[in-house]
């Protein structure tokens, strides 16, 4: 079974891909889809659509875990919600089951505290996936943490 974790955003979408073999977690890939801030918003959303489709076709995940978005009073709120909509549409078009997790739930599951720092989350991701390095950029580490949250929920520790 393969899972893709996704940390939504307009400028940067973090992703992390983990495979389960014989109840053991295996890190496959992580990174970000970056969009050009000088492009029009619709072009950036289309870039996310294309790049996520390419990732899905390459790695063929069975399930997905996506960070839930909560409304904040920010000028980027609408853009992030639109990017998340594109992400959900791509996953639905590929018939990939999606689970959603609040940031505090991810932190609690992975690092033991809903208020864990970014550093604590990254260290927990490294420990859980037996990595010798911190996934970069942070958005990719967040995406791996989101995927690990789903696996934990499924009883795969």
Curated annotation (Swiss-Prot):
The enzyme's main class, written as a single word, is: hydrolase
What's the protein name? Crossover junction endodeoxyribonuclease RuvC
Cofactor stoichiometry and binding remark: Binds 2 Mg(2+) ion per subunit.
Superkingdom of the source?
Answer: Bacteria
**Entry similarity comment:** Belongs to the RuvC family.
Task: Give the molecular function GO annotations.
Answer: crossover junction DNA endonuclease activity; DNA binding; magnesium ion binding
The UniProt annotation places Mg(2+) 2 binding at: 67
* Catalysed reactions listed for this entry: Endonucleolytic cleavage at a junction such as a reciprocal single-stranded crossover between two homologous DNA duplexes (Holliday junction)
- One annotated GO biological process: DNA recombination
> Which source organism does the UniProt entry give?
Prochlorococcus marinus (strain MIT 9515)
The catalytic activity of this protein is classed by the Enzyme Commission as: 3.1.21.10
- For the ligand (Mg(2+) 1), the binding residues are 7, 139
Instruction: Supply the Pfam families for this chain.
Output: RuvC
- Keywords from the UniProt entry: Cytoplasm, DNA damage, DNA recombination, DNA repair, DNA-binding, Endonuclease, Hydrolase, Magnesium, Metal-binding, Nuclease
> Record's Gene Ontology CC terms?
cytoplasm; Holliday junction resolvase complex
Q: Which CDD domains match?
A: RuvC
What binding partners and quaternary form does the record give? Homodimer which binds Holliday junction (HJ) DNA. The HJ becomes 2-fold symmetrical on binding to RuvC with unstacked arms; it has a different conformation from HJ DNA in complex with RuvA. In the full resolvosome a probable DNA-RuvA(4)-RuvB(12)-RuvC(2) complex forms which resolves the HJ.
Catalytic residue list:
7, 67, 139
Q: Gene3D superfamilies, from UniProt?
A: Ribonuclease H-like superfamily/Ribonuclease H
Bilayer-crossing regions: none
List, alphabetically, the InterPro entries matched: RNaseH-like_sf, RNaseH_sf, X-over_junc_endoDNase_Mg_BS, X-over_junc_endoDNase_RuvC
The cofactors named for this UniProt entry are: Mg(2+)
What role does it play? The RuvA-RuvB-RuvC complex processes Holliday junction (HJ) DNA during genetic recombination and DNA repair. Endonuclease that resolves HJ intermediates. Cleaves cruciform DNA by making single-stranded nicks across the HJ at symmetrical positions within the homologous arms, yielding a 5'-phosphate and a 3'-hydroxyl group; requires a central core of homology in the junction. The consensus cleavage sequence is 5'-(A/T)TT(C/G)-3'. Cleavage occurs on the 3'-side of the TT dinucleotide at the point of strand exchange.
Q: Which compartments is it annotated to reside in?
A: Cytoplasm
Where is this chain primarily localised?
cytoplasm
Disulfide-bonded cysteine pairs: these are none
